[in-house]
Amino acid sequence: MPTLNLSISELMELSYVKDLEKIMYAIRQFKGEVKGIEGDNIIVELEPDRPDILCVEGLARAIRSFLEICYPKFPFSAFKNPNIEVYVGNVKLRPYIACAIIRDMRIDNNFIKSLMNM
């Protein structure tokens, strides 16, 4: 089973849950097991059948949903004429692309680590 080493403070911030016991309870409901806590990190073992929760952002989203926590909606706008060209040659499965332009976002070491783990 995949084992994740996640920042507790980041998980609390993203899930809007400040109670570690509630977070650990929710993790157990996803067939997960808390293997240990080392400083600000929680070591979690999860089933591989839920790839959407194998990162801190996905796990936080699942915890919010499970605990029925509302979270703020972020504004977005569509561009009328996006200027993106993608060449897809001879691909029959998923010949699509999704992208976004994100502004005013804080990028720190935890965020980069999470991107690399995806």
At which residue positions do the language-model features occur?
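Phosphate-rich ligand and nucleic-acid binding surfaces
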Residues: 1-118
